[in-house]
Every structure is written in structure tokens, then in C-alpha cells.
Amino acid sequence: MLGGGLVGLAILFFVLALIFAILGARGVAGMSMSVAKWLVIIFIVLAIISLLL
């Protein structure tokens, strides 16, 4: 998988969002982009927590 873990999934959903936006499927692109955004936020929070512990 690309990058492994949450970052890989975020990149995957981002690429899917770009592909769907190009193809004109705005609803699917928006949903993929929101999933990617939340995965990145979760990854950042977990990274900060792991640095503090």
C-alpha cells in the first residue's frame, strides 16, 4: 500500500477524489475527499500523541 497505514489510505482517497472529479462524479469526489481529510486529521493527532508519550 502507498505509504502504509492512514497516510496511504488518505493518499488513495485523495487520488480517487481527483479521478472522480475529472470524470464528473462530483458527489463521489466530495465523499472521497472528506474521507481523505479525516484520515489525515486522525493521522496527525495520533502522531502528536505518540510523540508526547
From Swiss-Prot:
User: Which domain of life does the UniProt lineage start with?
Assistant: Archaea
Q: Name one Pfam family in it.
A: DUF1328
Q: Which UniProt keywords apply?
A: Cell membrane, Membrane, Transmembrane, Transmembrane helix
Q: Where in the cell is it found?
A: Cell membrane
Topology versus the membrane, per the UniProt entry?
Answer: Multi-pass membrane protein
- GO-annotated cellular components: plasma membrane
Q: Does the keyword rRNA-binding apply?
A: no
Q: Which InterPro entries match?
A: DUF1328
Which Cys pairs does UniProt list as disulfide-bonded? none
Record field: transmembrane: 5-25, 33-53
Q: Which family does it belong to?
A: Belongs to the UPF0391 family.
Which protein are we looking at? UPF0391 membrane protein Memar_0049
